[in-house]
Amino acid sequence: MAKKIVGFIKLQVPAGKANPSPPIGPALGQRGLNIMEFCKAFNAQTQGVEPGLPLPVVITAFADKSFTFIIKTPPATTLIKKAIKLEKGSASALSTKVGKITRAQLEEIAKTKMKDMNAANVDAAVRTLAGSARSMGVTVEGL
């Protein structure tokens, strides 16, 4: 018989830096899950990833206090900022432009994000990412 699911917890956790402090501790503690077990497993699975890169994680909590988790690809905005070496996006995206990104860079990001994106092909994913870049105040070239 399958385990009974009691809930899902969605968090963004820096790669290799999971610890029991907020937001992880309170979120897992509410469901009665073993916080240190999650932290150790998450840090072990994210060893090969750039430390500190925020990774979305979906934790499935079961009735017997066990859990499983799925680590997704980093957010598109984080990958865009990393590609053009930005600290943060523009406060007013329409009037203040903070950088430029090329179609080739967007294609590279799209290939990374493809498994988590709701796009039929790489071209559709590139257009989606271009919209995200524009909303951050980044000029998209070659699109």
From Swiss-Prot:
Q: Which CDD domains match?
A: Ribosomal_L11
GO BP of this protein: translation
| Superkingdom in the source lineage | Bacteria
Q: Which InterPro entries match?
A: Ribosomal_uL11, Ribosomal_uL11_bac-typ, Ribosomal_uL11_C, Ribosomal_uL11_C_sf, Ribosomal_uL11_CS, Ribosomal_uL11_N, Ribosomal_uL11_N_sf
Keywords in alphabetical order, please: Methylation, Ribonucleoprotein, Ribosomal protein, RNA-binding, rRNA-binding
Q: Which Gene3D superfamilies does the annotation name?
A: Ribosomal protein L11, C-terminal domain, Ribosomal protein L11/L12, N-terminal domain
Q: Which GO terms describe its molecular function?
A: large ribosomal subunit rRNA binding; structural constituent of ribosome
Transmembrane segment boundaries: none
Q: What Pfam families does UniProt report for this protein, alphabetically? A: Ribosomal_L11, Ribosomal_L11_N
**Record's GO cellular component terms:** cytosolic large ribosomal subunit
Q: How is it modified after translation?
A: One or more lysine residues are methylated.
**Task performed by this protein:** Forms part of the ribosomal stalk which helps the ribosome interact with GTP-bound translation factors.
| Subunit structure comment from the entry | Part of the ribosomal stalk of the 50S ribosomal subunit. Interacts with L10 and the large rRNA to form the base of the stalk. L10 forms an elongated spine to which L12 dimers bind in a sequential fashion forming a multimeric L10(L12)X complex.
Q: Which family does it belong to?
A: Belongs to the universal ribosomal protein uL11 family.
HAMAP family under this entry? Ribosomal_uL11
PANTHER family according to UniProt: 60S RIBOSOMAL PROTEIN L12, LARGE RIBOSOMAL SUBUNIT PROTEIN UL11M
In Swiss-Prot or TrEMBL terms, this protein is called Large ribosomal subunit protein uL11
List the source organism: Verminephrobacter eiseniae (strain EF01-2)
